Amino acid sequence: VVYVGLAALIYFQQSRFIFPAPQEVYAPAPGYQAVTLNTADGLALTAHWRAPEDGKPTLVHFHGNSGSLSGATSENRLFADQGYGVLLVEYRGYGGNPGKPSEEGFREDGRAALAFLKERAIAPKSIIIKGHSIGSGTAVNMALEQDAAALILVAPFTSTVDLVGQKIPIFPMGLIITEPFDNRAKLPQAAMPVLVQHGTADAVVPISHGRALAADGPTTEFQSFAGKEHDLTFDPEVQTAQARWLAELGL
């Protein structure tokens, strides 16, 4: 009875631990402006945007759990300083946005972000897709729909089923988790160059997830960072490594 009760608790409460959505609303940082992303299912989502300087690519960023537009600004400070276009996506149900978080909902949010860039005549081959943690799931989903220039995954998981199953191994998570974000099954289908970064001290998503994703991807480079934890995405060293990798691709 206790086992069944705990399984039911995980099933019915999973949105709370998969999507711990902060509600703080942040003003755009200098150089950014607030814009609206209109989703196909009728939501108007606030995002932050800075246009690219002439000849520079544009990066679309999907932040991690408990993240925000303010944090995403810090995660991409180096790119903004170098003149890249940057679109910081805020999900449905996060940061004062309407809607309820879900994998399919986040997919629609990502599509709205790419549509926003298309409206501004930004070519797919000038777009870099980037995701941290839970944002890696939407980044991978978008990489399968957009022929972008590159994909960057920071502290990604193979799937939420794998991740939660590692932390609570006594339950059949494949039957319980309804938001799988199955990066491992999808990433090999991505046609663009892929960079996976992970910290060796990540206690939230173990580095084994990043290694597994990199091993499965035909065009994937893996970078490990000794002693860095799950929030390595804010680290200037990590951002510099991203920029160096992009420069090698001519981006």
Residue spans of the language-model regions?
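Conserved alpha/beta-hydrolase "acid-adjacent" motif
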Residues: 203-209
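Membrane-embedded segments
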Residues: 40-120, 137, 143
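Hydrolase active-site cap/lid region
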Residues: 136-192
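Catalytic histidine-centered segment of alpha/beta-hydrolase-like enzymes
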Residues: 228-238
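Catalytic active-site module of serine/aspartate enzymes centered on a nucleophile-bearing elbow/loop
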Residues: 236-251
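Alpha/beta-hydrolase fold nucleophile elbow
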Residues: 121-133
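Short beta-strand/loop motif that positions the catalytic acidic residue
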Residues: 189-191, 196-198, 202
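An N-terminal hydrophobic leader/cap segment in hydrolases
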Residues: 1-38
